Amino acid sequence: LVHGAAHQIESCSKQTRHSPSNTDGTGITDESTLQVAIQASTMVTHQILEKLSISDLRGASTNAIVAHPKGIIQGVDQQHTGKIERVDERLLELLIGRDIIPVISPLGFDGEGKTFRVNSDAVALAVAKSLKAAKLIYITTQDGLVFNGQLIRQMAVNELDERLSSEESLFSPQSLSKAQHAAEACRWHVPRAHIINGCVAEGLLAEVFSNEGIGTLIYANKYQQIRPAKKRDISILLQMTRGSVANDELMKRTRAAIEKNI
C-alpha cells in the first residue's frame, strides 16, 4: 500500500506559514520542504496503520524504496528530490508472506541514511513492477480518465499512449501523472492498471468485483493474456455465459459439453 502526501504537505505548510518548494515529489525539494514532507508522510502512515488496526489487519511502515539524488536537471539542483534506484522486494515479500501489509510512504532512502522526497505515483509503479503485480490500482479524488466530459471505462494501453502523445493537454495534472504511470505499468507486464475515485463508498470493491467498475481500467494487449481453458474454469464459464444464453445470444451448453471441448 503506497500513499502520497501532497495534500498533507500543503496543509502542514499553511500551519507553519511555509511555502513548499514542491508538493508532489517531481520538482525541487529544499531542506524545509523535506522536513515538512517527512512530518506529513509520517502522519499519513500512522493514520493508515490505525485504520488497518480497526479492520484487524497488520501493517508495517517500511524503508523499502532505495533512492539517490535526482541531481542537476537543466542546470537546476533538485536538492532533496530523489530518483528511485530499486525496491527492496525481498523485504516486501517477507511481510506479505506473513500477512503484513507493507505501508510505503513517498520517501526514499540511500545507503548513507539520507532521505529523499519521491513521487508516490512513481513509487507505486516501481513496487508493482518489482513484485510483478497482477494489478496496479491508483486511488484518487477523480472518477477516472475523462475525455470530452465522458468517463472512459476501459482503454488498451496502446490507445492511451496515443492520447498521451496527441492530447496531453486534455489531462488534468493529477490525471496525467496517473495515466502516464498506468501506461508504463502495462508496458512493463503489469496486466491491468485501475484509476478510481477513493471518495466513492466501497469503490475499491466495486471496481475489482463488479462487471462495470467505477473508474478507468487500462489493460495491456489482451491477446497476451489469453490462455487455454482448464476444467477448473468450467463453473466460471457457465456463469459468464448465463446472461448471453438467456438473451439467446449464445447456445446453451451443459457442463459435460464444455468439458468435452477443453
Predicted regions and their residues:
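Terminal amphipathic helices with adjacent charged low-complexity linkers/tails
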Residues: 7-9, 200-204, 210-213, 221
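Nucleotide/pyrophosphate-binding catalytic subdomain
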Residues: 1-195, 199, 227-236, 241-248, ...
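Conserved N-terminal entry element of GNAT/NAT acetyltransferase domains
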Residues: 209-231
